[in-house]
Amino acid sequence: MKKILSLALALIMVIGSFAMLTSCQEESLSVAYDKALKAIDYDASKYTDTLTVAISPDFAPMEFYDTAKDGDSAIVGFDVLLATYVAKELGMKLKLDPMSFDACMAAVASGNADLAISGFSWTAERAETFLISDYYVAGENETEQILITTKEKAAQFTKDKTDFSGLKIGAQGGSLQQLLVEEQLVPKGAKLELYENINVAATALATGEIDALAVAYGNGEALVNDTIVLSDYYFEVDEKYKNNVILLNKEDAALLEKVNAALAKAMAAGLYDEWYEACQIYAEVKTADELGYDDDGNKITE
């Protein structure tokens, strides 16, 4: 009996130790991010007016969920840091409203959200429908557009591939990637499959429902696993589509001016690189060692 109790106690200790290790690992991933968020020095309790931001948290490292957290704090990523910074500069209480990517645009168009901040690129169609902010730069990996696929199919997607006949290529509905597939791959025989949620699309890729998925390179890095890999196929991307923008309602010209001022201030302060690197670590795209951060979330300089 004592032997059984000893074994049971040992098992409990092992499970407890594993849980503690997992918790510590999760906390270590967020150190640089938490430091960047704290540096913004934003206290929502100071403000009365609310800034509602539509966001689609399925696009790591730009925006994604940390399931260990609750409420608005569970939504993390580069665009969350940016939204927090903008809210502070505007003197407003930030409210994140999570929804699908295309619903973000509908929310702004209908006036149900003040801003849509969710890795949006400039497109001619969006310029007709919304007021569009100045660019913000979320790392070079967000300007490159790529196909991800499975290990078994990787050899099919070479950098100079010209025949996509019979291949199903996924993209998020309403995204720049949808536009690129329509313009560059459908004429070469590809069949476009649209998804509301990029994580659902990644599952469809892993299970063989589609042959490849069009994503921003940085997002592709976050989706890589034992099954999914980055392919060698890159889209040709016009300069006008590079970098990101914030979408506003056509009637909000005064708000646009304030948002652009906040973006200019963030750019001048050199915040974007720091934010993006912190989010790469958080999303496990890169390690702290790879990017040169210590255990306290500080950038190591020589």
What are these model-predicted stretches?
Residues 31-120:
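Extracytoplasmic small-molecule ligand-binding "clamshell" domains
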Residues 84, 93-163:
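Acidic, polar ligand-binding/catalytic clefts
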Residues 103, 119-129, 182-184, 204-207, ...:
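A ligand-binding cleft/hinge motif common to bilobed small-molecule-binding domains
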Residues 26-32, 43, 174-193, 233-234, ...:
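Ligand-binding clefts/hinges and TM-proximal coupling segments of bilobed small-molecule sensing domains
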Residues 25-31, 80-89, 151-155, 167-168, ...:
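Extended ligand-binding regions for polar small-molecule ligands
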Residues 57, 138-151, 217-263, 283-302:
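Periplasmic-binding protein-like
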Residues 78, 95-107, 156, 192-207, ...:
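Short helix-initiation/N-cap motifs at beta->coil->alpha
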Residues 57-60, 72-88, 120, 142-198, ...:
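Bilobed "Venus flytrap"/periplasmic-binding protein-like clamshell domains
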